[in-house]
Amino acid sequence: EWRVSQLQIRESLIDNIGEDAIRRFLRSRGIEKKDLGQEFKYFVSNAVGIDIMEEEFEEFCYNHLMYGKRKLVRVFEIANKRKITDDELWLKALKKDFLWDSLNMCKILKTDVSSSDDWKVASVKTVDDKRGEVESICILFQCYIRVTKKISKDHEWCTYIPVEVDLK
């Protein structure tokens, strides 16, 4: 029986996570690639939404992109955190700059960048403390990159930039 998922997984997402990591994830769910002629992105697209839930795969992508092997860690001390613990200020800034309307939403599978729209938010997750103030916020940015070369062909791809702000 031939089944086709409506979701199309982008090759850039596979490149950023790594085909091996995605294979291991799918294999742990009992899903193996059987059609040797099928491109990997089509295999993943068909598996997501048919064999596994879209939300489960998106959570895997989020964890891998935020905390996986490609993460660069920099630590800064924030002198005055009072102004940046307000949910409304974060939401206002995200809405103004990225048309983002939630402090807890993941759209990794549906966010795509291009040369004309090169910087987007793919996910935001916040944790509030007992007083309702932001304790931590994780923002996953998706960025379009184009490298122009004089001699050879230009290269373009997208990358994900994880930012975690811990205000404890």
Range-by-range predicted roles:
Residues E1-V163, K168:
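Intrinsically disordered, low-complexity polar/charged tails and linkers
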